[in-house]
Amino acid sequence: MLRLKTQDSRLKTQDSRLKTQDSRLKTQDSRLKTQDSRLKTQDSRLKTQDSRLKTQDSRLKTQDSRLKTQDSRLKTQDSRLKTQDSRLKTQDSFSVDDNGSGNVFVCGDLVNSKENKVQFNGNNNKLIIEDDVECRWLTVIFRGDNNYVRIHKNSKIKGDIVATKGSKVIIGRRTTIGAGFEVVTDKCNVTIGHDCMIARDVILRASDGHPIFDIHSKKRINWAKDIIISSYVWVGRNVSIMKGVSVGSGSVIGYGSIVTKDVPSMCAAAGNPAKIIKRNIIWARTDKAELISDDKRCSSYHAKLTQ
């Protein structure tokens, strides 16, 4: 009997413990449910925040797109204003007299330019002046059709250019030309290379200006011929270079010369008519240079011409 009571007491104790454990498990389960509910709430909040962030990101992208569009429009307006400003500067520095049709004048951003004139007396002529060119008291006259004149960037030029009957005149980069300069053409080409130094009152006459005939054949005998001045040539003051002449790179033409025959590269020529007085020379724009290496441009051309 005593044993049964003891077993019964033990069973009751175990049952009590099981109930306690069950109560604890229920409590834990309740806590887990609470945590799960909180996690779901947090997850919902995170999803809401993520949705808001996506909405904000979308709005920011839209704003960024609008800003880019506005920036593009502002750049376009700025470009137009610069173009208008360039045209106004060109109009301010050039007077244009167009007496034909199909004529074109393209002008870049000029430097310190004033009192220039362009006159078109014909059709389909073209004048192109590139950026950073300094034009002062320059007159360009087109006579007839299909003439072409181009002045490359970083050049400085004064004087008169007359292009006649399908002629072409090209002036290279960084070339400087003094006042009183004159180019006369007639169905021919005049080319001045890069880095040339042309003094005041220089005349390049590719045409005699008026025809001369043989009285027996009755045919013209003085047709115009091309003039070519290569890059890096120094032409002194009051020089006249006549039709058909070519002057080689690195050469110098002395004061007051009349050049009727070709001058090779790296030669000094002078006189009337000009003759070669010294070979194997090269000049420098820098007046203080004592060696070829003292002038970068001179050194560069010397290397090219002697390699």
From Swiss-Prot:
Binding, acetyl-CoA: 208-210, 237, 243, 261, 278
GO function terms (MF aspect): polysialic-acid O-acetyltransferase activity
Alphabetic keyword roster: Repeat, Transferase
PROSITE patterns recorded: HEXAPEP_TRANSFERASES
Sequence repeats, residue ranges: 3-9, 10-16, 17-23, 24-30, 31-37, 38-44, 45-51, 52-58, 59-65, 66-72, 73-79, 80-86, 87-93
EC number: 2.3.1.136
InterPro entries: Hexapep_transf_CS (IPR018357), Hexapeptide_acetyltransf (IPR051159), Trimer_LpxA-like_sf (IPR011004)
Biased composition annotated in UniProt, kind: Basic and acidic residues: 1-90
Name of the top EC class for this enzyme: transferase
Chain segments carrying region 13 X 7 AA tandem repeat of RLKTQDS encoded by a 7 nucleotide repeat: 3-93
Catalysed reactions, semicolon-separated: [N-acetyl-alpha-D-neuraminosyl-(2->8)](n) + n acetyl-CoA = [N,O(9)-diacetyl-alpha-D-neuraminosyl-(2->8)](n) + n CoA; [N-acetyl-alpha-D-neuraminosyl-(2->8)](n) + n acetyl-CoA = [O(7),N-diacetyl-alpha-D-neuraminosyl-(2->8)](n) + n CoA
Keyword Repeat among UniProt keywords: yes
Outcome when changing residue 210 to A: Loss of activity
Region Disordered, residue ranges: 1-95
Top-level taxon in the UniProt lineage: Bacteria
Keyword Repeat: yes
Similarity section: Belongs to the transferase hexapeptide repeat family.
Entry function: Catalyzes the O-acetylation of capsular polymeric sialic acid. Shows high substrate specificity toward polymers of sialic acid that contains a large number of residues.
Further remarks about this protein from its record: Polymeric sialic acid-containing capsule provides a means for the bacteria to evade the immune response during infection by mimicking host sialic acid-containing cell surface structures. O-acetylation of the sialic acid residues of capsular polysaccharides alters their immunogenicity and susceptibility to glycosidases.
Assembly information from the UniProt record: Homotrimer. Hexamer formed by two homotrimers.
Name the UniProt record assigns to this protein: Polysialic acid O-acetyltransferase
Species the sequence originates in: Escherichia coli O1:K1 / APEC
